[in-house]
Every structure is written in structure tokens, then in C-alpha cells.
Amino acid sequence: LVGSEMCIRDSDTVVAFRVSSSQDSVDFSSLNKLKCPDSVIRLKNIWDIYKFNGDAIISDFDLITKDKKSQTIPDGVQFLNKDLIFLEQGAKLPFCTLNATNGPIYIGKNSEIMEGSLIRGPFAVCENSVVKMGSKIYGSTTIGPHCKVGGEISNSVFFGYSNKSHDGFLGNSVIGEWCNLGADSNTSNLKNNYAEVKLWNYESESFINTGLQFCGLMMGDHTKCGINTMFNTGTVVGVFANIFGSGFPRNFVPSFSWGGNKGFTTYLTKKAFEVASLVMERRGCKFTTQDSEILKEVFEISKKYRSY
């Protein structure tokens, strides 16, 4: 785009626009309209993040590897469809299996795929992330930067700095930043009666039909769950929740909740932010005043949902 242009889709949906950096406001009626290519992925619902992840990986793979040369696949790695496997500088992958038959596999800078891991594309692991020994990962899955993952993962997206280091199944799910799933935590992604999954929707403040048969866990930033946690099909968890104990917790856990199947209390911001500061400091990051102010507002907005 050049100055005073915008890209639109479906006649009125603004995808992108470009104006002067000195403008305080934008008059869209004054901008020249350009039709957005139909190939551009549009996210209308939270589950679209994993639903269209395979398409996104394929598109991004072509873009990020253009005019670049992959590092050599090490001896001992078993692979299929070499042309759709790309290794960035510093990637380590001893004795694993990479199958790019169904889509590309991208291994980010300084990431590690430990021995015995089985990976099917489309798959992307971003820089400085680790796939633990013996992991089984199906497409279409993306592991964000600075993550540690293990166990069995299928068609899921991890944002940065989140961990699922141990055994347990995660499928058709979206995990935010700074999350941690305890050992042997499992997510159901299919109802026993094979019915379409309903998911909590903040806009309507109700459960809505996704039209999907497979839908797992939507977990907000800074949320943690203890060992052996079980999540039911179509569970939504807000930010800064701490879930533990036996049995299935409710399938909508509001932000700043503390507890599990036997009940919840409010996770107060003072303690929540102390933990976040410690967690982020371990990774060389800082929990800023701006972070605190934004999340205090989230705490207030989400109060109405914490009617335990």
C-alpha cells in the first residue's frame, strides 16, 4: 500500500490501510479502496486460529524461505519430502523423524527437536523453542518462540514463552503466552456423542455453536494448570487463571480464577503479578508497569464473570 490507500474484503471489511504517521484519526471515506486478495486468511472466531493454521504455515513457509538456503538435515534424521523441510541456523535435531508429505516443516533459529520425536507437517517451531524427547506432533501445529513442548499435540497453536513439557494430549487448541500445562494434563477435543462443540463467546456472553466436531482448549495468557488436569471439549480459560485438582473444571473459567472442579476463588492481582514477574524474569523479560495497568483493567472488566 502507498499513502491514502486501504485494502478491503467483502465490500466493507478493512484489512489494512496506510496513512501519514502524523495523523491522529483516519477518515476511511477519503482513502482509495483496493480489493484484498481472496487468499488472505480472515480470522472471525478464536477457533479460526487453529482451523486455518495449516494454510498459514504453507503461506508463511513460502515467504520466509524465499531466496534462503536451509541448513543440512543431520545424519540420523529420518525424513520425507526434503524440499518442504527448512532448518534455520543453530537448529538442533538429533535422531528425530520429519514427515513433510502433507505440508511443510519449518525449524526455527536455535530451536531443538530432541531425539525420538515424530513430527508431521504442516508444522512450525519458532526460534529458541524445544520439542522434548519422544514427542508426537501432528499438523497443523505451530510452536511459538521460547516454548517447551512434549507429549502428543495435534492441530494446535502455542504463542510465545509457553510450556507443555510433559506427556498428555492437546488437540485443536490455542495456548496464549506465558502459560504452563502440568505433567499429564489432557484436553478432550471430541464430544462422546460426536455433536458439534459449543464454546464460550465473550461478545454474546453465552455459549455459541462453533459448527466444529473437533475443538479443544482456548487458554489465555499467564494461565497455569497443575498435574493431571483434565479439560473438557470446548473449554475457554481466561488470563491469569490457576487450575488444579481432580475432575473436570467448568468449560468456561473466567480470568483471574483460582481453583478447579471443587470450586474457584478470585486470584488477586497482587499475587498474580508477583508470580508473573518471577516467571518472566527467569526468561530475561520484564513484567512492566504498562503490563500491570492493562491487566488491572482486564481484572475489573472480568469481575462480572467471577460469580462462583
Predicted feature residues:
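Glycine-rich hexapeptide-repeat left-handed beta-helix
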Residues: 133-134, 140, 146-308
